[in-house]
Amino acid sequence: MRTRWGWALLVLWAVSLLTALLVYGQRQLSLFDPDGKLLHLSTAPSFDTELVQLLHHQNIKAGSVVHVGTTSRCYCESLTSPHQNQLLASLGEGYQSVRLNIDEVPALQAMLHAVPALIVLDNQNQLRYLGPYATGYGCFTGKNLVEQVVSYATQSPYNGAVINADAQGCFC
């Protein structure tokens, strides 16, 4: 009888733990562009050019990998460091890492609902990618988008930017 109670308590503990993890995980999972604002803006023919000009006014040059975050550096931002390092290593020389606080750029804040976000400008100052670093729970158990971003950044000929607004992951 005693072992049955022991097993019942063990099963109850395991179910409680898994439920707590699931609830916590669901709170960490959010949409990158929940109301479709970025998707709508990106359909304008001048979107790429306007975003590059906005970045130019922030002294961001060609060949930049721009990390868009907040001044408070939320938990989800801390998970992007490995992605940033992998991306810069894969792109090689000619690319520099730049940090941009969304709080300081109201026009960018009006476009992006969630951070961390990634913007890649190639060496010809063309927008190549705008979107998240990764998707999934905590942005480390899901899909790492670094290889795709590298292929977008180095694709020839240039066919326009990839705007990844349809993503779900750890965003603030």
Model-derived features: positions:
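Membrane-embedded segments
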Residues: 81-82, 107, 115
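Thiol-based oxidoreductase modules, predominantly thioredoxin-like and allied folds used
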Residues: 68-70, 92-106
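Hydrophobic membrane-insertion alpha-helices, especially the h-region
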Residues: 2-27
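Short extracytoplasmic/periplasmic juxtamembrane "stem" segments immediately C-terminal to an N-terminal membrane anchor
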Residues: 34-52
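Short active-site neighborhood of thiol/selenol oxidoreductases, capturing the structured segment around
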Residues: 53-75, 149
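A short, hydrophobic beta-strand/beta-hairpin element that forms part of a small beta-sheet core
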Residues: 114-134
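Thiol-/selenol-based redox modules, centered on thioredoxin-like
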Residues: 134-172
